Amino acid sequence: MYNSLSALPYIPYNILVYLAHQEVAEDLWKLLKYNSYDALSKPNLTFDQKLELIWRNGPQEKFGVFFTPLVEDAICESKCVLKIYDYYIHAKELYNSTVVYAFDFLYGGQMSLVEYNGVPVSRGDLFINKAMAVLNGAEVGGVGKLTFLDDMSRYALGRATIGNSKTFTGVQLFLAVNVGDTGEEYGCES
């Protein structure tokens, strides 16, 4: 009985629920929900409004949060999209693996800037700043905490310019957490 990664399917949702409960993440939700330059001056979302942004099935254009790297019909040119998914799984030992989660934050070129503390800033830079402030060190259902640390994974990084470079752009942030268990018992002996 070795690591079966039993917590793996739940971690993206756990991350989102954690973000929805954190008061310090309100600006992050506003960046996602409101497309305007003054997005941060808009009202906070309720917990239910935040979770209603999650796409579950069917047409995607009404939603802003996805647990898959493939988003087929959510139009990034006209709104912000957040994708949270496991990017890389590295087996460290029999009972423990490092899982790297990707956070893709996409938005149209016309909404690239927001006002923050009276100055124009990059929506992508502010997303990375707010995500790091809330998630770096968060308990999300793994073994230990979600971290931005090269010692945990060489994939822990942030980078700009994802998208099609013509009508939408964005940023990517990679955070890692250990996931492990003693597995589920299968085999000839069971």
Question: Which positions does each model-derived feature cover?
Answer:
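Small/polar-rich, solvent-exposed N-terminal microdomains that initiate assembly or binding
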Residues: 1-93, 190
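Acidic, Ser/Thr- and Gly-enriched intrinsically disordered low-complexity segments
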Residues: 45, 71-82, 109-146
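Hydrophobic residues positioned within well-ordered beta-strands of beta-sheet architectures
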Residues: 82, 99-103, 171-173
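Acidic-leaning, charged glycine-interspersed low-complexity segments
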Residues: 121-180
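Aromatic/basic-lined ligand-recognition segments
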Residues: 183-185, 189
